[in-house]
């Protein structure tokens, strides 16, 4: 099955000049969604990561399922003040400013190999921030599905 048939391009959303990729049709089809998870998990497994990181909210559509499929820990990456314990945070650029992404301080250990999962790529800022967070904690980035993007080439 061609998964791209379940991802719809929506022009000028959320603003003029932006092509938004709507993945809800993919998630409405259990067979297509399962295939997408299986294909991503297969690629990520080749990098032999110890943990999967994904950012809220749309990264949570894929990251936890991939982690379960590979029997790996899932590290939720949240915005500032959303995690209850001590955190490691990294500032990242948005189209309209900056924000902070955080993980619990003990979520990633020195020497861990991490895989970074996100749903889409706009500027690459979210994925880059997740990679930097892992590196601050002493981990090595072993996989990001966005590896072809110029912003991230130096991280993998």
Task: Report residues per predicted region.
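Active-site-facing substrate-recognition patch
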Residues: 1-48
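Short glycine-rich phosphate-binding loop at a beta-alpha junction
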Residues: 49-56
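Short Gly/Thr/Asp-enriched flexible loops that form oxyanion-binding sites at enzyme active sites
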Residues: 61-70
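Short, glycine/charge-rich flexible loops or terminal/linker lids adjacent to PRPP-binding catalytic cores
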Residues: 72-114
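Conserved G/P- and acidic residue-centered "switch" motifs that form tight phosphate/ATP-binding loops
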Residues: 119, 124
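Active-site/ligand-binding-proximal alpha/beta "capping" segment
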Residues: 125-136
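Conserved small/polar residues in nucleotide/adenosyl-binding loops
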Residues: 144-151
């Amino acid at each position: 099955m061609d998964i791209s048939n379940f991802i719809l391009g929506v022009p000028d959303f959320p603003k003029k000049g932006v092509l938004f990729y709507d993945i809800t049709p993919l998630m409405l089809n259990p067979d297509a969604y399962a295939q997408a998870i299986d294909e991503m998990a297969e690629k990520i497994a080749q990098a032999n990561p110890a943990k999967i990181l994904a950012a809220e909210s749309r990264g949570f559509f894929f990251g936890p399922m991939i982690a379960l499929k590979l029997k790996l820990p899932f590290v939720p990456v949240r915005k500032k003040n959303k995690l209850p314990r001590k955190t490691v945070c990294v500032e990242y650029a948005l189209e309209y400013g900056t924000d902070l992404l955080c993980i619990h301080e003990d979520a990633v250990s020195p020497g861990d190999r991490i895989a970074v999962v996100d749903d889409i790529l706009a500027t690459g800022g979210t994925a880059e921030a997740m990679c930097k967070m892992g590196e601050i904690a002493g981990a090595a980035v072993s996989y990001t599905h966005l590896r072809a993007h110029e912003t991230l080439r130096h991280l993998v």
